[in-house]
From Swiss-Prot:
Disulfide bonds: none
InterPro entries the UniProt entry points to: Methyltransf_11 (IPR013216), MeTrfase_VrtF (IPR016584), SAM-dependent_MTases_sf (IPR029063)
Biological process terms in GO annotation: methylation; terpenoid biosynthetic process; viridicatumtoxin biosynthetic process
Gene Ontology molecular-function annotations: S-adenosylmethionine-dependent methyltransferase activity
Biotechnological and industrial applications of this entry: Viridicatumtoxin and its derivative, viridicatumtoxin B, exhibit anti-methicillin-resistant Staphylococcus aureus (anti-MRSA) activity. Moreover, viridicatumtoxin and a C2 acetyl analog, spirohexaline, have been demonstrated to inhibit bacterial undecaprenyl diphosphate synthase, a potential new target for antibiotic development.
Pathway this chain belongs to: Secondary metabolite biosynthesis; terpenoid biosynthesis
Transmembrane parts of this sequence: none
This protein's UniProt keywords: Methyltransferase, Transferase
Classification via SUPFAM superfamilies: S-adenosyl-L-methionine-dependent methyltransferases (SSF53335)
Family affiliation: Belongs to the methyltransferase superfamily.
Enzyme Commission number(s) from the entry: 2.1.1.-
Described function: N-methyltransferase; part of the gene cluster that mediates the biosynthesis of viridicatumtoxin, a tetracycline-like fungal meroterpenoid with a unique, fused spirobicyclic ring system. The first step of the pathway is the production of the malonamoyl-CoA starter unit for the polyketide synthase vrtA. The aldolase vrtJ may be involved in the synthesis of the malonamate substrate for malonamoyl-CoA synthetase vrtB. The polyketide synthase vrtA then may utilize the malonamoyl-CoA starter unit, followed by sequential condensation of eight malonyl-CoA units to form the polyketide backbone.
Protein name: N-methyltransferase vrtF
């Protein structure tokens, strides 16, 4: 997979949004209603408002990193204090611009980078979120699990990482609607999660964090992990 990493960590929303960004805004508005509303509840069996949004709201710190912000739904609905420093990360610039546009914070910072690689900044975040991101990454489950190994180096000693993703393996049998949706997103190349499973993700979290909480709701793996297992060099930098 070819990826691009930009080390400029002070990107703000370009006021002259391109046609591509405008098109994607409509695309992602549909996503917000369809995926976070209908599909999450009725296909994956995990209500966004009942399970995911409450976890997000309970785990936002004073220096927060949101990875793969999409429509900015969680950032708008998450009750983030005005005093919280907010950074958005995405691989694609149009998606990053859209997140900055819709997050409700004019002072939010944008970071264009590949989450599969170590972050090109030295910031230490006390909270990191990634909701409905991992199942969209075209990578092996091993590479996805490695995200937790390198992102912990950008977290404070008491930092928290939390999120959720749709599993492709070791979950309940899909109903007719879920099977229809799953076939569609796999065929379209939106999902890359055939081997994504709760065991591997939980193992990776426990290898890199002292405290780990996970559960599977329907077909969705929900996680919260805190107190990253940092080495001496990381502790000296904090």
């Amino acid at each position: 997979m070819t990826t691009t990493t930009t080390t400029d960590d002070t990107q703000k929303l370009d006021p002259s949004a391109s046609d591509e960004v405008i098109y994607k805004s409509w695309d992602l508005l549909i996503y917000e209603i369809w995926v976070l509303g209908i599909v999450s509840t009725w296909a994956w069996g995990c209500s966004t408002t009942e399970y995911l949004l409450p976890q997000f709201r309970a785990n936002v710190g004073t220096n927060h990193l949101d990875v793969g912000s999409g429509t900015g739904y969680y950032l708008r609905k998450g009750g983030i204090p005005a005093s919280t420093r907010l950074t958005l990360l995405d691989l694609e610039r149009p998606a990053l611009d859209l997140g900055l546009q819709r997050c409700g914070r004019s002072d939010a910072r944008g970071l264009q980078a590949d989450i599969l690689q170590p972050l090109p900044v030295i910031d230490k975040f006390d909270s990191v979120s990634m909701y409905y991101l991992l199942h969209c990454i075209p990578a092996s489950v091993e590479d996805k699990c490695a995200i937790f190994k390198h992102i912990k180096h950008n977290m404070t000693p008491d930092g928290v990482i939390h999120g959720a993703n749709v599993l492709g393996k070791g979950v309940r049998n899909d109903g007719h609607f879920a099977a229809y949706v799953r076939r569609g997103v796999l065929k379209a190349g939106i999902f890359h999660n055939l081997d994504d499973n709760a065991y591997d993700f939980e193992h990776a979290l426990r290898m890199n964090f002292e405290e780990v909480e996970t559960r599977v709701v329907g077909s969705v793996f929900i996680f919260r992990a805190s107190r990253p297992k940092l080495d001496e060099g990381d502790l000296l930098e904090t």
